[in-house]
């Protein structure tokens, strides 16, 4: 049970963390473009 729960949590968190990293990188890229202009 514990292993299944942990695997479920990991499978749920991994896509969220990857999406968060992409969003933060995209926002920083947008800010950099605005600052350069």
From Swiss-Prot:
Annotated membrane topology: Single-pass membrane protein
Gene Ontology BP terms: cytochrome complex assembly; photosynthesis
Transmembrane segments: 5-25
Protein's UniProt keywords contain Transmembrane: yes
Keyword entries, A-Z: Chloroplast, Electron transport, Membrane, Photosynthesis, Plastid, Thylakoid, Transmembrane, Transmembrane helix, Transport
GO MF annotation list: electron transporter, transferring electrons within cytochrome b6/f complex of photosystem II activity
GO annotations of cellular component type: chloroplast thylakoid membrane; cytochrome b6f complex
Main localization category: plastid
Protein localization: Plastid, Chloroplast thylakoid membrane
Subunit structure: The 4 large subunits of the cytochrome b6-f complex are cytochrome b6, subunit IV (17 kDa polypeptide, PetD), cytochrome f and the Rieske protein, while the 4 small subunits are PetG, PetL, PetM and PetN. The complex functions as a dimer.
Family assignment from sequence similarity: Belongs to the PetG family.
Biological role: Component of the cytochrome b6-f complex, which mediates electron transfer between photosystem II (PSII) and photosystem I (PSI), cyclic electron flow around PSI, and state transitions. PetG is required for either the stability or assembly of the cytochrome b6-f complex.
Protein name: Cytochrome b6-f complex subunit 5
Record organism: Chlorella vulgaris
